C-alpha cells in the first residue's frame, strides 16, 4: 500500500440511552464524477481502529462503569451530526447486513455483568478488500443500549488511500451507497 494516510474523528457519548452521530467530511478525497478521460476517485478504507476511553479522552474506562453501546462508521451522505436523544436511527443500520456499514464495534462496560467481553469488533474492512467510499460523508454512529454510568469518548482512526475507479466500478459503488 502506498499513499496511505489517516483520518480520524470522535464523538462523546452521554449516560442515557439513544443514538448519536458525528459526521466526517470526505468531500476533498472523493470525486464520483468521471470527466472525459479523468476517472472518478474513491476513498479506500483498509483498516478502522476503534478506541473507547473515559470522558477526559485519556483514561481507560473505569472498571466499575456499567452500560452497553454499539458504534460504527457508515458511508452515508446527508446525515447531520446529532447528540444522543436528538438522533434516531432506523432499524438495521448498525449491523453487518447494512451495505453502508464500514466497520462496527460492541462495547460492554466492565461493571455491567461478570465476565463482560472486551470491545468486540463485528465488522471491518481488510487490506485485501477495502471498503471504497464514493460519497461526501461518513458518519460515526452509536446507539447506547443500556444506560451508561459515565460518559465516554468513542474515537476512530481510518487507514485509507485515494484510488481511481473505472466507470463500471464507480457506477456500482454509487448504486450501493445510495440510501
Regions found by a protein language model. Give the residues of each.
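Beta-rich globular "head" domains
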Residues: 23-89, 155, 159-161
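Extended, solvent-exposed segments with strong compositional bias
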Residues: 77-132
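C-terminal interaction-tip segments
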Residues: 1-21, 37-42, 52-54, 63, ...
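A structural detector for beta-sheet-dominated domains
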Residues: 10-14, 27, 46, 51-53, ...
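Extracellular distal adhesion/interaction modules in secreted or cell-surface proteins
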Residues: 4, 12-13, 31-41, 86-105
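Generic detector of solvent-exposed, compositionally biased contiguous segments
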Residues: 1-27, 107-131
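Short, flexible coil/linker segments at or flanking structured domains
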Residues: 33-38, 121-122, 126-128, 146
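Noncatalytic modules at the cell exterior or secretory-pathway interfaces
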Residues: 40-51, 129-148, 152
Amino acid at each position: 500500500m502506498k499513499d496511505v494516510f489517516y483520518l480520524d474523528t470522535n464523538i462523546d457519548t452521554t449516560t442515557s440511552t439513544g443514538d448519536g452521530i458525528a459526521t466526517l467530511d470526505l468531500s476533498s478525497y472523493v470525486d464520483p464524477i468521471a470527466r472525459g478521460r479523468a476517472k472518478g476517485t474513491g476513498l479506500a478504507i483498509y483498516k478502522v481502529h476503534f478506541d473507547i476511553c473515559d470522558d477526559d479522552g485519556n483514561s481507560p474506562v473505569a472498571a466499575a462503569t456499567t452500560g452497553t453501546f454499539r458504534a460504527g462508521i457508515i458511508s452515508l451522505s446527508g446525515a447531520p451530526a446529532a447528540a444522543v436523544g436528538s438522533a434516531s436511527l432506523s432499524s438495521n443500520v448498525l449491523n453487518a447486513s447494512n451495505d453502508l456499514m464500514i466497520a462496527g464495534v460492541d462495547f460492554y462496560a466492565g461493571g455491567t455483568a461478570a465476565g463482560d467481553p472486551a470491545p468486540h469488533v463485528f465488522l471491518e474492512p481488510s487490506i485485501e478488500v477495502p471498503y471504497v467510499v464514493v460519497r461526501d460523508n461518513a458518519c460515526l454512529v452509536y446507539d447506547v443500549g443500556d444506560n451508561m454510568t459515565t460518559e465516554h469518548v468513542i474515537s476512530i482512526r481510518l487507514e485509507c488511500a485515494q484510488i481511481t475507479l473505472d466507470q463500471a466500478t464507480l457506477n456500482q459503488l454509487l448504486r450501493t451507497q445510495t440510501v
